[in-house]
Amino acid sequence: KLNAPPGLAPEELTLFTRQILRQKYVDADIGITGVNFLLADIGAVAVTENEGNARLCTSFPKTHIAITGIEKILPSVNDLALFWPLLATHGSGQHITVYNTIFSGARKENEIDGPEDMYVILLDNGRTNILADVTARESMFCIRCGACLNVCPVFKNIGGHTYKATYGGPIGSVITPYLSGLKSYKHLSYASSLCGACTQVCPVHINLHELLLYNRNKSVKAHCGSRSEKIGWLLWKKACLSRAMMNMTNGRIKNFMIKLLFRKSWGDNRSLPDFAPKTFNELWKATEQ
């Protein structure tokens, strides 16, 4: 697609791509960046990065558009002394990221660099729904470091694309039902072992596993589940409470039934886990004999 010569080494491919992208930055009329923090006292946006692409986006184009959620406001620029290292340490294990920039507007008449125009777009997209909920409000403390994703056993196994949402991992499972609808995304709150590892590593002390339970409770009270789902879980409960029913069939039949019932809801991104040929109870009885 880019007409790269065949047989290039990884380093050569990097240089080849860099030349193409650098020209695109130079020719662009508009540069769009995200925002890590909004600074209320000086009316500025703070961006932290390791590659320097955000600086390129704001240096060459005539117009800089910064897009951010409304929850990223810090009271003072002095708070960056805490939050920039906090984000770097929990996000990538660094003391501080390589490039840290504060943008306070378009360039003045006597300045020679920076964009001629700057626009900041504040996104709500359901965030006020979260802020209105006293219990769920603490999820808006998130600084997007990704620490909860790195320790989550579910995220490690299914990956980010399986969530089919803007935000994945534990924090995504907490906030997505508010941002995109509880009925459509209630299942994300069940994609958790409730081990609490996400809560332990969160730098801003969000009780993520408790908020996942809270979302589950809300979905039940809102009657978001279908009738077939309720019947299915009732049968599952009866089977799990009966040792005779648990030992009734072997692993092969259980695998067939689970794939038949849950293949569609499980999705195509991951294969269903297999049952062991014998249950632990059966193996224990065989050992006792």
Residue ranges of predicted features:
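Ferredoxin-type iron-sulfur electron-transfer modules in oxidoreductases and energy-metabolism complexes
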Residues: N110-S139, V154-F262
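Secondary-structure junction/capping motif
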Residues: A9-P10, S76, H95, T101, ...
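Small/polar loops that bind or transfer phosphate-bearing groups
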Residues: T68, R144, P203-V204
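Acidic/polar loop patches that form or flank catalytic/metal-binding clefts of enzymes
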Residues: P75-N78, G91-I96, N150-P153, N157, ...
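The feature marks the mature, well-folded catalytic cores of soluble enzymes
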Residues: K1-V134
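Short linear elements at protein peripheries
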Residues: I253-Q289
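Phosphate-binding glycine-rich loops and their immediate beta-loop-alpha structural context
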Residues: C142, G146-L149
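Short alpha-helical basic/polar micro-motif
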Residues: D41, N150, Q200
